[in-house]
């Protein structure tokens, strides 16, 4: 999104954002999204052991997954295993080999995003992998990497200085009771300690993103406001704050101990928008930044095509989803035999891809009519007539007064985009849970 577009998006919420969409309508939207995710994010994939070569003129983004953690958080549904150094070092070697296979196919990338798990379980291997990626793919302009508060001030972490442009740190909350309930207090320390580590990390990376979650049990309006005020005082370059996601995998623990069953997500989201207003620009429905032209966690907004490497990663290339093996053993065997880690694929219809792009456009705060015309040969008002009618009827989008091609998301639209993306990610988490279910001890 251009600077001018982001400035106009911010104008939509600048004067005390107010979400007027009735709660029953938002509940209905969530039920509708759950229907569509169940329909489209299901395991009806076809066996596959290769990915296609890149298309001329297309932009690509590279994602790499590191599936190891020293401890496993109860609310996390990402693909991860308990850390073992021998397994992790062998994994990084395989990851670098898979990168070389992508290079041999002709790929280059504009951005690299490394997620997990905990990407920094072996900082020396991570640094070596990033250096290898930069050498293989000279088009990479920005490297983003996830981490947790534990590693921020370790001596070995300095190996990432100059290699990582954007560091995203999962904090979730500064409230002591919430951190204790989520088992993070014992792992990462008191909120004041985490705050000081973040303050020091700001000087070591061009972009520091702090990742927060709202919707926890016990997270009253006062607690959430205190979190937001601490964030603005800390002043990281970027903030990502999204609702707690309850999936099939986490439903029992999250509903019983973690999730706020009485949450009014509209009031929480209004508070977040209005607290960060004036300090940050809106990047997506749940991402905020000091600058308008930087990458952020939801890379799918800016890239139609991305390639995922590593066990448990997903690729979306040319309207087809590719799924890498969730078994570390099978992943290693495939790489050792000269094949990439992909095991299955699923092609999506033109209409399904249009709906997906519509979701991302709303989540990103803007919709380009010419984008749909160029990519699908039709206007969104024709190809997605029901969806567009609903957005206008609920006051979720409005015409950009400076650009007849663009529609802007209002606070109602940002609320819709947030809930739609929340349910989309929850659907992806359910897919991960199904793919992990058959794994046994020999798959580690």
Segments from the language model and where they lie:
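Short, amphipathic alpha-helical interaction segments positioned at domain boundaries
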Residues: 412-444
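Minor-groove-contacting beta-hairpin "wing" of winged helix-turn-helix DNA-binding domains
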Residues: 404-410
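N-terminal pre-triad scaffold of radical SAM enzymes
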Residues: 43-79, 96, 106-113, 119-120, ...
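A short, conserved structural fragment
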Residues: 392-402
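C-terminal scaffold of the Radical SAM
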Residues: 83-102, 111-378, 439-444
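Short Gly/Ser/Thr- and Asp/Glu-enriched loop/turn motifs at secondary-structure junctions
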Residues: 107-109, 209, 401-404
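Short amphipathic alpha-helical interaction segments
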Residues: 378-392
